């Protein structure tokens, strides 16, 4: 089968925004104008095509990034047909991992901003992720029909808050309820969309007289941005010559691809205006797979390799999302970087060194699917029934193995205990959690050895709510959630010598007798955690009982004398004791050892250790004082801050127990404009008052 669309006409783009900037509605309109969906889905009535999980339609927020293929030939059919693969990404801070993984497989992005709200906090986080992966982007200022809409204010915020070199491609005609269309600054024509056919057709008209001067000024700004692409154009421009439309467009494209400028378009997706011109901008300015650098990877011999976007190169692809589908089981979304694959072919998962057979391949249109026989470089598709693939794995040709750059996923930061409501739910819950953990690398499940409870960990409180919600809906498992947990530890600070433990029951018949004398001493936290030294001389305790002494102490370490938490970082020296020919046994020595350990532990200055998190907060400069003040109240140690003019990064170490509810508090202190990440750093001694409260709570 030959390629239907040349790879130069592919656009793999993400649509990214803050919650409520109208991203899903914008995506819906793209699907409508590109002829994929015949009825426009509205988020307002829970019918949007891209939001396909029930919860998304209820909450009106997008959680999973669905990938959809659409075709576009331009507003006035001025291009050959282009294939646009759209990845819809969530805008909520708890789902940053979803945004991160879609940025990894995109070539370009459309950043959607609300004309009223402007550049909001999550937009700053998403912007930083796009910078990290060097994704070329354009902006679409949506909701121009809303009260308080102000296009140029948003352009200004792109410059001041994000440090973007924002260059408007259009100016809006009117605003709020008087918003009627846009002026194309390259053509210097007004575009008016026909409301009768939901904006499918439009007319070019003269620029309104009252906008002429403004449009001239902004066109000058645009042409100058284009001229900076090369010395020849700059000379032509400075010499007073006009640049042709073709020259302007190709120069702007060059600068967008180099991440030097952000072109800004505007409209109202809800009112069917502007999305059509934004699609033209996607085709004209965002990269094809051939415009971006070859993807890097590691060859089997550990040297660096790469794959170019070409059908001729060996097959390589990256699995970027696993989704569970009610009808076909696992869907593995993957992006093809090079080569061709047919359904039925076998490939290598080079990360796990396992072979996988591509049974069926489907191209997704939101939640509808079309079976296809082959995929080629540049395609994004989903495979059904791959056995052992997780997010971030490379699938490649068996004869040309390579491991493509992996995605990095943050460590989970919050844990809660879950228990099934009924016995019947028990087994189903294990299955459901395993399935969900496979889909989402930032979600983990483990069993707490101390309490036997099932603990789930994730990126935030909303993240875990949604996991529990999905268990209920998709797997019909009802579960109760506990309070967020902190795992403390216990240890000692001073050495104690010659503490004895004696277990003796000798009242006629076979008795029990064990007697040990031990020293207890602290170990370095970087060390083994526990050591046992046997220094018995002259057989005062026979060799066969020594392991029982060690075992008796190790059993005590699982649940410490202070508050029942695991004991770490201590050593035991066994150096004296006594035994009885008849009455001594392994059990008696085990019990004697545990008595000696408890007695020694209480004398060795026992302390409670708490987990300390490494916390990084990124905040606009005006909130630094509030953020640091709040961190100090949480017993934080602030290690330093780095600033540029848009954002200050604060590094701190904070006890985990003080971080519950932090996301909500940080949001309210900074009007939602700051973001934070945290990961486990170390254990440190808890202050006396904190330790006393924890110990007290455990006794209840």
UniProtKB/Swiss-Prot annotation:
Residues 8-290 form the tr-type G domain. It comes from the Bacteria. Disulfide bonds: none annotated. CDD domains: EF-G (cd01886), EFG_III (cd16262), EFG_mtEFG1_IV (cd01434), EFG_mtEFG_C (cd03713), EFG_mtEFG_II (cd04088). The keyword GTP-binding applies. Its main location: cytoplasm. One of its GO terms (molecular function) is GTPase activity. GO terms for cellular component: cytoplasm. SUPFAM superfamilies: EF-G C-terminal domain-like (SSF54980), P-loop containing nucleoside triphosphate hydrolases (SSF52540), Ribosomal protein S5 domain 2-like (SSF54211), Translation proteins (SSF50447). GO terms for biological process: ribosome disassembly. PROSITE patterns: G_TR_1, G_TR_2. Transmembrane segments: none annotated. Pfam families: EFG_C, EFG_III, EFG_IV, GTP_EFTU, GTP_EFTU_D2. GTP binds at residues 17-24, 88-92, 142-145. Keywords: Cytoplasm, Elongation factor, GTP-binding, Nucleotide-binding, Protein biosynthesis. HAMAP family: EF_G_EF_2_B. Catalyzes the GTP-dependent ribosomal translocation step during translation elongation. During this step, the ribosome changes from the pre-translocational (PRE) to the post-translocational (POST) state as the newly formed A-site-bound peptidyl-tRNA and P-site-bound deacylated tRNA move to the P and E sites, respectively. Catalyzes the coordinated movement of the two tRNA molecules, the mRNA and conformational changes in the ribosome. Belongs to the TRAFAC class translation factor GTPase superfamily. Classic translation factor GTPase family. EF-G/EF-2 subfamily. This is Elongation factor G. The gene is fusA.
């Amino acid at each position: 089968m030959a390629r239907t669309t040349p790879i130069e006409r592919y656009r793999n783009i993400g649509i990214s925004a803050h919650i409520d900037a109208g991203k899903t509605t914008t995506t819906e309109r793209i699907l409508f104008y590109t002829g994929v969906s015949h009825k426009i889905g509205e988020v307002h009535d829970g019918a949007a095509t891209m939001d396909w999980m029930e919860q998304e339609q209820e909450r009106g927020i997008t959680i999973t990034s669905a990938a959809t293929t659409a075709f576009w030939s331009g507003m006035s059919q001025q291009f050959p047909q282009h294939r646009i693969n759209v990845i819809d990404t969530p805008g909520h801070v708890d789902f940053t991992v979803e945004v991160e993984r879609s940025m990894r497989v995109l070539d370009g992005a459309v950043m959607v901003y609300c004309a009223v709200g402007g550049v909001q906090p999550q937009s700053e986080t998403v912007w930083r992720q796009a910078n990290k992966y060097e994704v070329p982007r354009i902006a679409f200022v949506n909701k121009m029909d809303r009260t308080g809409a102000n296009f140029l204010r948003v352009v200004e915020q792109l410059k001041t808050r994000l440090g973007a070199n924002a260059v408007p491609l259009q100016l809006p005609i009117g605003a709020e309820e008087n918003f009627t269309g846009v002026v194309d600054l390259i053509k210097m024509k007004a575009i008016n969309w026909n409301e009768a056919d939901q904006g499918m057709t439009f007319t070019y008209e003269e620029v309104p007289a009252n906008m002429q001067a403004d449009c001239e000024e902004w066109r000058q700004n645009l042409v100058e941005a284009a001229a900076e692409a090369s010395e020849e154009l700059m000379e032509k421009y400075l010499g007073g010559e006009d640049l042709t439309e073709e020259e302007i467009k190709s120069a702007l494209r060059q600068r967008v691809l180099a991440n030097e400028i952000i072109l800004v378009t505007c409209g109202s997706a809800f009112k069917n205006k502007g999305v059509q011109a934004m699609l033209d901008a996607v085709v004209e300015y965002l990269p094809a797979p051939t415009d971006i650098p070859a993807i890097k990877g590691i060859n089997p011999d550990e040297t660096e390799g790469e794959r170019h976007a070409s059908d001729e190169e060996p097959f390589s692809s990256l699995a970027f999302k696993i989704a569970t589908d009610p009808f076909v089981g696992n869907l593995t979304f993957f992006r093809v970087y090079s080569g061709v694959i047919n359904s039925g072919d076998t490939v290598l998962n080079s990360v796990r060194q396992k072979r996988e057979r591509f049974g069926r391949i489907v191209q997704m249109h939101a939640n509808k699917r079309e079976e296809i026989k082959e995929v080629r470089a540049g395609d994004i598709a989903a495979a059904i029934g791959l056995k052992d693939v997780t997010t971030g794995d490379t699938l490649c040709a068996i004869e040309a193995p390579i491991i493509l750059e992996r995605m990095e996923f943050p460590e989970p930061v919050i844990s809660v205990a879950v228990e099934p409501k009924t016995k019947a739910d028990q087994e189903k819950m294990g299955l459901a959690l395993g399935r969900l953990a496979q889909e989402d690398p930032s979600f983990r499940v483990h069993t707490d050895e101390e309490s036997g409870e099932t603990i789930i960990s994730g990126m935030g409180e909303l993240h875990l709510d949604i996991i529990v919600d999905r268990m209920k809906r998709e797997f019909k498992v009802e579960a109760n959630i506990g309070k967020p947990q902190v795992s403390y530890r216990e240890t000692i600070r001073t050495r104690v010598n010659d503490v004895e433990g004696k277990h003796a029951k000798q009242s006629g018949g076979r008795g029990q007798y064990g007697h040990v004398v031990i020293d207890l001493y602290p170990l370095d936290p970087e060390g083994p955690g526990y050591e046992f030294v046997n220094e018995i001389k002259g057989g005062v305790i026979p060799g066969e009982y020594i392991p029982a002494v060690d075992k008796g102490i190790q059993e005590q370490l699982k649940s410490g004398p202070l508050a029942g938490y695991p004991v770490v970082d201590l050593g035991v020296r066994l150096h004296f004791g006594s035994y009885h020919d008849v009455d001594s046994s392994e059990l008696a020595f085990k019990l004697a050892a545990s008595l000696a350990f408890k007695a020694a532990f209480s004398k060795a200055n026992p302390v409670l250790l708490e987990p300390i998190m490494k916390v990084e907060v990124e905040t606009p400069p005006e909130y630094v004082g509030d953020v640091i003040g709040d961190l100090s109240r949480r017993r934080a140690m602030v290690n330093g801050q780095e600033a540029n003019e848009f954002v200050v990064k604060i590094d701190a170490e904070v006890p985990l127990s003080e971080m519950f509810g932090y996301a909500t508090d940080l949001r309210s202190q900074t009007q939602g404009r700051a973001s934070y990440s945290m990961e486990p750093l170390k254990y440190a001694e808890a202050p006396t008052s904190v330790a006393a409260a924890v110990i007290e709570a455990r006794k209840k």
